[in-house]
Amino acid sequence: MGKYFSDIHASCESQFRGLPHGLADTPEIAACRAEPENYEALLSLADALCWQLRFREAIDALTRAIALAPERIEAYRKRGPKYLDTLQFGAALDDYTRCERADGVSVESRYRIGMAHYMLREYDAAAAAFSDSLALVSRDDDMCVADIYWLVLSLLRAEKNADAHAVLRQHYAPDMYVGHHTAYEKAMRVAAGFAELDEMLSELEAEPEDLQYTMAAYGLMVLLESRGKQARTEALREKILRRDGFWYCFSYLAAYTDAAQAEPD
């Protein structure tokens, strides 16, 4: 996966549960550690650690940077997403909120805050944030379909199915611009009634990329859940969790969190 992260990288369990990852420092990480500790050096160290998906160590580096210059916002911008990637959703929301106060409301700030609320299972708050983001985004921006996807899923989870379908009628079109978010569009195509769920699931079975599979399949999983198909929901979630090649994508994090919530005490 060298396009996005190192081929040698930390596992999801090491980052979700704080287990040893067994990785040696890369030359880039070692070089960053050798630098005198200052704000910029710690941000560079965090970036180098993230290339190996060593997000918990990156959080530590960014927290040390914040201690050196708590008034600066750059480390908070980097730390919030890493908290989300390690299932520390409340901490992610705190950092996202701080950044929005500093930087102003934007498509990205509302989207990130919505994502934190969704992971916390605060679906009404998530829907409000995604709705805000959707109101700001341009129709020719690929974030539009991402907002639609997560807004619809938030509303379905909040048991507001009529509102979810109203969003689809107002904002979704099969020929809308989606950029690289083709997997989100596939799930929304089914939700909007332009494709059959079982046909899309069959198509996904041939998808070679875990990222694309997970993004589309998670949306279909929530759709199945909203239709009362619990056994099929759980079976699809199991398939998603086995496709962990891009484990820090939002849809995988959501599926993993759903599974953890479903486990008996």
What are these regions (language model features)?
Residues 31, 64-65, 98-99, 133, ...:
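Canonical positions in the second alpha-helix
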Residues 34, 68, 102, 136-140, ...:
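Structural marker of alpha-solenoid helical repeat scaffolds
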